Amino acid sequence: MDLKTKYYLKSKFQEYYRTAKIHLPAKLPEREWGVLSFDDMPETVMRRHKSFGSAGEVEDYLTGMAPAHVYYSVAYYTYPNAPTMKEKQWLAADLIFDLDADHIPGAPNSYSDMLDHVKKETLKLYDLLTDDFGFKEEDIGAVFSGGRGYHFHISDPRVLSLESAERREIVDYISGRGLNLDKIFVKKGVSGDAGSEKATMNVFPSEDDGGWGGRINHHMIAYLRELAAKEDAEKLFTGFDRIGKKTAKRIVEILRDETQVDLLKKGNMEALSRVNKDIIQTLAERSVTELSASVDEPVTGDIKRLIRLPGSLHGKSGMCVTSLSISQLEDFDPLNDAIVFSDKPVKLKVIRTFAVQMKGKDLHVEEGVQELPEYAAIYLMCRGAAEYGP
């Protein structure tokens, strides 16, 4: 990034911060702060061990310095501006989840498609946190990172004192890591008629049970019934390992029988297991993959982590780190709603071919002098794909 581009970006960020609505963390004086400056680029120098006593101090700093990236600690400290972590004296920490395209398997290459994919993972995480951990919507602060994903902030008193290992256990649960399906899908003894041997029955948690068992049951039966309702259902089931035409026909019959489906929902999987003993295991594994959420474990486990400040700008995109309610998250379009700069034309020198979709426009930019809307020009400059001016 050349000097002219640095000055331009810093001036635009400064202009933004003069009127920006910044969402400051609770217990502001107990937070450590860190920033990355345009002045230091291309070097990445985190200037941390800062603290602010009031909202006014934060606003003055942002307006005066216009940093490229702004972070604050998830932790609360007695002395947040002390030069070493030991001297800061850790008190507690918010519970943070980071969902980023870099850590989500199968994320598309297209920026817009990638962000849609990450949002779906984020909403899955919300379901797990509310249904299985009992958090309420108001306990969870959702934030678009300004780049490639979303953060969840939880400041519930019950989680503030959790150690790193305990936070990693939460990640293990929501990712389905280490989930032992053999302990969920069990054989249960059933008394036979007088004089007969005791029989066994394949039992799974009912769809109304809590935790992974009920979650898997509901997802698995819904998926099976969706397949069974199709005209070519039998053909679809022959696509499973070791299921021939006869077996597929019997499976479809079971899934179209409401009495049998009610038994399946209650956890009695005997009808399906008799037809094909592997199908429940296969489908349960599929459900875990579909229902689990991929989060960045080191972020959640780090009780001294710095996290982006909501309302600040992301120095690699020029977009706003945006606070959202869960209802807002569902309809949120970051490539429109997180853009804060104008449409006025800006001349720039593109140094590598670039393509991005912003504000509903597909922008394909070739090398050389170009004129783009301000928001797109800033995005390219922040990405290192262009320099300011002709």
Swiss-Prot record:
Any one Pfam family here would be DNA_primase_S
GO cellular component terms attached to this protein's record? DNA-directed RNA polymerase complex; primosome complex
Magnesium in keyword set: yes
Q: What is its EC number?
A: 2.7.7.-
One MF term from GO for this chain? metal ion binding
Needs which cofactor? Answer: Mg(2+); Mn(2+)
Q: Which CDD domains match?
A: AE_Prim_S (cd04860)
Indicate the segments annotated as coiled coil, or none if absent: none
Name the residues annotated as catalytic in the UniProt entry: D98, D100, D296
Q: Which keywords are on file for this protein?
A: DNA replication, DNA-directed RNA polymerase, Magnesium, Manganese, Metal-binding, Nucleotidyltransferase, Primosome, Transcription, Transferase
Q: Which domain of life is it from?
A: Archaea
Q: Enumerate the InterPro entries for this protein.
A: DNA_primase_S (IPR002755), DNA_primase_ssu_euk/arc (IPR014052), DNA_primase_ssu_PriS (IPR023639)
Gene Ontology biological process: DNA replication, synthesis of primer
EC class (word): transferase
What task does this protein carry out? Answer: Catalytic subunit of DNA primase, an RNA polymerase that catalyzes the synthesis of short RNA molecules used as primers for DNA polymerase during DNA replication. The small subunit contains the primase catalytic core and has DNA synthesis activity on its own. Binding to the large subunit stabilizes and modulates the activity, increasing the rate of DNA synthesis while decreasing the length of the DNA fragments, and conferring RNA synthesis capability. The DNA polymerase activity may enable DNA primase to also catalyze primer extension after primer synthesis. May also play a role in DNA repair.
Family note: Belongs to the eukaryotic-type primase small subunit family.
Q: Which PANTHER family match?
A: DNA PRIMASE SMALL SUBUNIT
What is its quaternary makeup? Answer: Heterodimer of a small subunit (PriS) and a large subunit (PriL).
Q: What is this protein called?
A: DNA primase small subunit PriS
Q: Which organism is it from?
A: Methanococcoides burtonii (strain DSM 6242 / NBRC 107633 / OCM 468 / ACE-M)
Upper classification of the source organism reads: Archaea, Methanobacteriati, Methanobacteriota, Stenosarchaea group, Methanomicrobia
